[in-house]
Amino acid sequence: MKTIIVFLSLLVLATKFGDAKEGVNQKQKKEVTQNEFREEYLNEMAAMSLVQQLEAIERALFENEAGRNSRQKRCNGENVPCGPNHSTCCSGLSCEETFGYGWWYASPYCVKPSKG
């Protein structure tokens, strides 16, 4: 019986002082959440600023590339069909009718020019 009274009194004291600290805990929770949201907001703003800077750099690079037309035209390598319907042969190769391919596929091929 004495132990039950002791436990009940502890329960009442814990409840009373727990409620007293609950207001303080709520204030602390509000401060923590406000700080977290503020930090998240600042981090988000920094990330957005970084994204905008990267987009500006990318836009400038693509404008320069489009303006100067820096992409090389593709060319055909050795033993690749060439002619009016195909792209041109790479440097060092010429578009010729060859015995090995031309008679079978009926189109000229890019080959190394013959020395002679």
From Swiss-Prot:
Q: Does the keyword Disulfide bond apply?
A: yes
- The disulfide bridges present are C75-C90, C82-C95, C89-C110
InterPro entries according to UniProt: Toxin_22
One Gene Ontology MF term:
toxin activity
Which tissues does it occur in?
Expressed by the venom gland.
GO cellular-component term (any): extracellular region
Cell division: is it a keyword of this entry?
Answer: no
* Chief location bin: secreted
Residues that make up the propeptide are: 21-74
Per UniProt, which keywords does this protein have? Cleavage on pair of basic residues, Disulfide bond, Ion channel impairing toxin, Knottin, Secreted, Signal, Toxin
- Cell location: Secreted
Where is the secretion signal located? 1-20
Assigned protein family: Belongs to the neurotoxin 14 (magi-1) family. 06 (ICK-Trit) subfamily.
Function of the protein: Ion channel inhibitor.
What does the record say about domains?
Answer: The presence of a 'disulfide through disulfide knot' structurally defines this protein as a knottin.
- Which protein, by its recorded name, is this? U16-barytoxin-Tl1b
